[in-house]
Amino acid sequence: MPESKRLRIAIQKSGRLSIESMKLLKSCGVKFTVNEQRLIAHSDNMPIDLLRVRDDDIPGLVMDGVVDMGIIGENVLEEEQIERERLDKPSTCIKLRELDFGACRLSLAVPNEFNYEDAASLEGLRIATSYPNLLRRYMQRKGITYNDCMLKGSVEVAPRAGLSDAICDLVSTGATLEANGLYETEVIYQSKACIIQSSQPQEPAKQALIDKILSRINGVVRAKESKYILLHAPTETLEQIVALLPGAENPTVLPLNDDTNRVAIHAVSTEDLFWDTMEELTKLGASSILVMPIEKMMG
């Protein structure tokens, strides 16, 4: 198939989103083999090419129409959109959906000895960051002036190195901040991974493939968020038991052989079934309670 007819999806070459992005696509039935020495991986069973690139290149590739889709952190997407708007370059794309991985937050942090009250405490100080546009937007909204120190990595060492008074960096657990004598003060942006599409018109066949991939992604994400619940229940407490099942659709109720006083309940729950809920179910006479993961869902 000509390259122009193949769907091009950009993903992070290496880093926190790379493995999860490839896992997601494989869960959607896209088969491919990655050669670490090559930036392009061709799907074995679908007209799809994966471009493995730097994460901060992905938004621009999608916005310029070089690739058709991309999986990227919302923080990187927003940073690039602000920069492109400033430079009067193409800055639009279609955000298809958030994904269930890559959660992090962009936060301000200061040295442990810093007497921090609120963001105004940073007035006139130097802040190191890899996200100058998101930081600038936040500080402008607060009416705070500051000096920025642009770094591409190792932002957390800037205060100790005498490069800045504070930092604005991505935080997942806070362990890196603690190891560098810093503490988090303000969250300025919450982020997850998301999947985006070029806003340029697509040929019908390619758009149909995009829609198919998105439908499968929706099914994979729904399955991760859901559990399949099976249990036996007395008919006299059936309504109470069904009411306890968290986020469940209308369950399937089936008779049990040789037991007219009990039924089998099959249900899909979109919320966690906690131990205390299971104990309540048991008190109502439920037995043989099974809670199982779901691999795929559709419809």
From Swiss-Prot:
UniProt cofactor(s): Mg(2+)
Coiled-coil parts of chain: none
GO CC terms in record: cytoplasm
GO BP term, example: L-histidine biosynthetic process
EC class: transferase
E.C. number: 2.4.2.17
Reaction(s) catalysed (UniProt annotation): 1-(5-phospho-beta-D-ribosyl)-ATP + diphosphate = 5-phospho-alpha-D-ribose 1-diphosphate + ATP
Cellular compartment(s): Cytoplasm
Main location (coarse class): cytoplasm
Activity regulation as described: Feedback inhibited by histidine.
Gene3D superfamilies, A to Z: 3.30.70.120, Periplasmic binding protein-like II
Family: Belongs to the ATP phosphoribosyltransferase family. Long subfamily.
UniProt-listed NCBIfam families: hisG (TIGR00070), HisG_C-term (TIGR03455)
Alphabetical list of HAMAP family matching this protein: HisG_Long
Protein name according to UniProt: ATP phosphoribosyltransferase
Species this protein is from: Shewanella sediminis (strain HAW-EB3)
